[in-house]
Amino acid sequence: IPAGFDGFRIVQFSDVHLGTLVCPEAELSRIADSINSLHPDLVVFCGDLVNIRGSELDARAMRLLGGLRAPYGVVSVTGNHDAGVYIKDSIAHPAQASLAEVVARQREMGWRVLEDTTVYLRRGGDSISLTGLSFDPALRHLRHAPDLPPANLNAAYRGVPDSLYNITAVHIPQLWDQIAGEGYGDLTLSGHV
């Protein structure tokens, strides 16, 4: 990692599954307070904010999670529950509409959703790249498989210099071999497990 990022503090969390919380306000307050008490430079959320529907990310949850504070902000990627179909009435509540709702509400909270995108962070004259990989709904039925078919990583890493330190955020850890095989993911953050 470049010298300018020595001591750079990243707090990563994932798999909140809002629809499964028994006492959402208390649990989300505890999560937000814990994260903020660590004084992170950057917060990275690695997917599965909701369990079934985008509407689980309601005003109360948005207020609490929107209170996360870090100088470099909060970035996120989507997970299989954010992008998947886990209910019988998926015709009435299409997965794509729910995913769009989750992404829109995260942006409304001030989170930067990285959808197969790379951004650059600068500190002390040094730079690193931060790539976020969206959950591919085509992998929905393979989400727990140990090996995945080749993923198209080109768009996410397009133009990223090989020599630049790269942090990759991805929901499913099974993509690590492919990411590393492309020469990226010096640090890979994932959830799902």
Please describe what each predicted stretch is.
Residues 4-193:
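Soluble catalytic domains of enzymes that build or remodel membrane lipids, polysaccharides, and related
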